[in-house]
Amino acid sequence: MSFDNNIPTKFPKLEPRGPAGELLLASERAKASFDVKELSKFMYGEQWLAKMDKVLNVISNEPAFDKTGRYYESRQERVANGFKKDKRLIELVKEQNWDETETNIATFLYDQSTPFSLHYNMFIPTLRSQTTDEQKKLFLEPALKHQIIGCYAQTELGHGSNVQGLETTATYIPETNEFELHSPTLTASKWWIGGLGKVANHAIVMARLITNGKDLGPHPFCVQIRSLKDHRPLEGVTVGDIGPKFGFNSVDNGFIMFDHYRIPHVAFLAKYSQVKPGTGEYSKPPNAKLSYGTMVYVRANIVMGVRYALAKATTIAVRYSAVRQQFVDSANPKKWDNKVVETPVLDYTMQQYRLLPTVAAAYACFFTGTEMIRLYNLNQVEMQKGNFGLLADLHASSSGLKSLTTTMAAEAIEDCRRACGGHGYSLFSGLGQFYQDYLPNVTWEGDNYILTQQTARYLLKTYRNVVAGKAVPSEYNQTVNYLTQYLQNTKAKCPVTVPTDFNNPEVILAAFGFRAAYGIAKAAEQIDNQGRSWNSMLVEINRISRAHCQFLLVRTFIIALQNANLDKATTAVLRNLATLFALHTMEKELSDFLLSGYLNGDQTSMLKEQVIVLLEQVRPQAVPLVDAFALPDYYLHSALGRSDGNVYKAMTEMAEREPLNHTQVVSSYEECIKPFVHAGQTTDRWNEDGTLSAKL
């Protein structure tokens, strides 16, 4: 009888031991002291949730949006499937008559950047904000119709955060009214450019503008790089993919070099600055600060994105920790149907300490991101009136918050993965690939350490202005407010006498404000009075930016709850969450609070005690709180974070889909295994089925 090697490996139909995951999660959900759906509506809005359901019903039945094979794909397969998704999305927008919100929801739910991502996220927004009316017709309108596909080429092989150090040049040629793009060195290669490797036929290229012999620094140009006829690179352009990366491998990040490549005058994006045809005379922007508004918007949206990253990671880890049972707690044995069973991992204090503050951080980032968008919109209105008073504080805070919150998210995703134990190491957890793809956030749109310098420069300048009486408290400038309060009493002490005093929002805000102000004051003293160089102060610079932004996160969370239109039960749960976030942050940063003299040793002990109390109070609401994030299983794509709790069944089903399990015998058997197994063996020692006989 011949052997059929094409029979896939299947698990026997058995049930997991112990209480079913579905029942365990149902038990957790029954503990909710608030209305989960109402909290979801408060966070997202009823209309947005309805649109998400509508879009989900469509894409979950679309082959191009199928995630089933995602964890088994090669890089080429991932890129190819990304193309299929992008093409089908364009078709669905027309077929379903989706608006911009619904289109964005479809991309959000698919949760994987694809080849066209940078066309939507960078190319089109730049064309909208930096072009003249003529250029909008020439570039933006066809881009919106996908008649041209673009990317944003700024970073180079030799320079990233130092934009002023970019080497690519764009020299104006008055005789032909053209610009000549050129890459003078190897390090001038544009590098890491998403969508450039194989997709884009146009690029926004940041190049040093040279006209009449003057180098005017980097400016944007809209440059055609590939033929619209056959997609081949144009003469004078060398372009390709940079190769496999730590993550983000569904996107064709690319490189490009220019060899005296001529482009027309209209390629220079001229909304804010102009080069006069024929003479090359340069007109600078009316206000250099105008470009800051776009940066604030991008960074505010990154903070909004952090809440989804934290929400996804904690939803998976908290649900799994409620289902996963390990050991029997002899001091407090868990019973199910009158039988002692193993304890859910989430009942262990250490697991609570690892996960619940991160749940709180997700909510903190929700409120802070929302507030940043509100302030951005307010600032746009004020700038139109010629009032730039809000811009400096908003720009500095958005820079620092981008740095702080994306670092928080990257660390939290990995912490949540580890909190899932051994199964967290499987891609099926939904956390490994997610972590890999999220990591670029800590370096793009400004390296996180370098961004803190922008924040710190503003903080130090503001401190000097407050000291000199040039800045007064304002509703919109919390930096001036806490610095003013600090200078009124630089020897202030924390008033806490019992652990529960730390639950007082005023106590919390005073502590965070004093700590931030103290750090700024000491840094200013070292730079201004002791002659310390900026480079020698970079560690402290990072600390004061971090302290300032932690103050903003805590304050925004607390103030938002004071103004929120929520019922008492929901407000009470969220207040516990806000307090946990604040006190856990204080505990992690204890050295700052102690060094400033604001906290004493006894108070730090009370602080630690109160953190544990808050963990106990938040624990029963853990699963309901992550359910309120309203993240569908399709989005999570996780065996461990399933809403029905059937994690073990999901793990085995995903293992069955592993391509290695599609056959019984591995393809390399004949070449690499059989020669060793058969060497020197005599067949009389083998049974008919190939088992080794026990007889000598």
Predicted ranges, named:
Residues 1-696:
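Flavin-dependent oxidoreductase catalytic core characteristic
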